[in-house]
Amino acid sequence: MCFTLKNNTIAKKTKKKYNTFVVLTNVNYKHIKFILKRGNQLQNYVFITDSDSDLPYNIVDERKIEMIYMSYNINGEEFFDDLGRNQAHKKYYDDMRAGSVPRTTALPSNYFVEYFSTFLKEGKDILYLAFSSQLSANIFNVFMAKEELLAKYPDRKIIVVDTLSISYPQAILVIMAHDLYKEGKSIEEVANWVEENKLRSQAWFTVDDLKYLQRGGRISAVSAVVGSLLNIKPIITESKEGKIVSIDKIKGRKKSLHYIAQKVADNLDENVDPHLTIIHADALDDANMLAEKIKELVPNIEKIEFSFIGSVIGAHCGPGTVAACFFGKKRAN
């Protein structure tokens, strides 16, 4: 992108701030500054993620992020996770407690062909920050669609980044990458930043009822029964490979929340904004308890946000799940 400016000092200032080439001439600097601040409108690529990020819909709307809504099924009826816009999270978890059994499936490749085609027809390139390839066949269907579309649109770019994350760790990467997008960074620059930093986005979970992990095949039926009888709460995290792994078992809910708070304290990086967010599956009291313990261990923490775990992720972990998500040190597990 090239803009012309009237004075060398302003030219240098603009080049440094907005990373754009400038030529000296008589142009109103304020007008150029306004145009450059609209970076997302000037970009020749679209910024896309999916609802498995559990990104709150108000942030999606505010940032105008393109969103792929993942699907789930209840009693043969298909729904799409709309991030709580029309489908209340609390009701969803109340229904699960009452016996509702949501099941999730990957979107077919033809869905992505149709979705991406909308932008490719407009001459736009595509950057898609996808949830972890280790948790679904979804990303493989994306790559099938990409191959088909590039044969039809050989002059376009489709960059798919496997974030190796799901739920709010993915959302944190999306928010930070979208800031770069708004600054006018190229599609390659944004994709490379995510690749280089994705293992710094962490989540530490604990579930309330083991039957949901057992139903999803994460633990055996025997382990679920024994664990429930002994009030065992597994500690779950996202691994370096992008898998969901159980790394410890703690007896009692309060102790499990304290364990997570300590993991947060151990893994924060004081040199960056952690975007610390506690997510929960209709367990706000426990989320607040976790927040208070984190503040006790990390007194200088400036802000802790709260958000819901979405429908697709919640189908696997169940009501009562609580997690702390943040951007910090690289994952060790």
Label for each model-derived stretch:
Residues 39, 44, 52-61, 65-71, ...:
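Mixed-charge interfacial surface used for oligomerization/domain docking
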Residues 46-106, 111:
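N-terminal glycine-rich anion-binding loop in soluble enzyme alpha/beta folds
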Residues 8-11:
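Cationic, amphipathic, low-complexity segments that mediate targeting or membrane/lipid association
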Residues 97-128, 132-135, 140-144, 191:
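Glycine-rich phosphate- or other oxyanion-binding loops that anchor nucleotides, phosphorylated ligands
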Residues 16-41:
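Short, Lys/Arg-enriched N-terminal segments with co-localized hydrophobic residues
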Residues 86-93, 116, 121, 148:
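A short glycine/small-residue-enriched secondary-structure motif
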